[in-house]
Amino acid sequence: RGGFRINVLPPEAECLVAGLSADAARPYCDRAAAETGVRYELREEGDSLHILCRGKGAHASLPEEGVNAITGLLHLLCSLPLAKVGSTAALRALSALFPHGDCAGKALGIAQSDELSGALTLAFSLLTVNGTGLEGQFDSRVPICANDENCRAAAEASFSKFGFSVSGEMDAPHHTPADSPLVKALLKCYEQYTDYKGECLAIGGGTYVHDIPGGVAFGCCMP
């Protein structure tokens, strides 16, 4: 399991592996640590091995600023000499869809960008695995060019290839033109009182204005 909020890149993830000793796993952990930047801590519990992965948390809109502990754990598990059963096959499939370091959704088939709002970002944020199955959640901040066909439907098609079902809806990206009367008035006030040139910014964070048509997030910010 790993993660604690969908909008936070998971800083920690853990698992319990049966029939594996710390000595046997350590070389794989050392190799995976060098490849991912994740730190792996091992503790034997009877006949099982507890693995704790420590990455670096970040906001889901800026996944490149962190180190995803969930994808780091999947990366390690795919390298371990584990039995070829349904659960390990599912974890390998997840790692193929969310390879460590892929913050743009390339493997999921949804990578895209546009000049106004930049590139899509993707963070695999939550994962729970138990004896009956697994459940995960990911957070994606999409550019203006994203729509149901090239984003949600494309992701569902990728998941279905591995037998995963998908639930949840896609929120359309929010955009207000820079030449709207509201934006022009706000920039004029900013420039008048700061003597700095005002410019519009596109960010991955939703902000509370997301559901207000024609609205923008605005506040005091110096260059």
Name every feature range the model reports, one short phrase each:
Residues 141, 172-177:
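Short, contiguous acidic/charged loop-to-helix segments that flank catalytic cores in large enzymes
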Residues 166-172:
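Short linear capping/connector segments at secondary-structure termini
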Residues 148-164:
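Redox- and metal-dependent alpha/beta enzyme cores, enriched for Fe-S-associated oxidoreductases
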Residues 10-13, 175-187, 214:
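Short glycine/threonine-rich loop-to-helix capping motif typified by GTGT followed
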Residues 130, 184-223:
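Zn-dependent metallopeptidase/amidohydrolase metal-coordination segment
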Residues 83-84, 155, 159, 192-193:
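Noncatalytic alpha-helical scaffold of FAD-dependent oxidoreductases
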Residues 1-143:
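Midchain, well-structured core segments that form catalytic/ion-binding scaffolds
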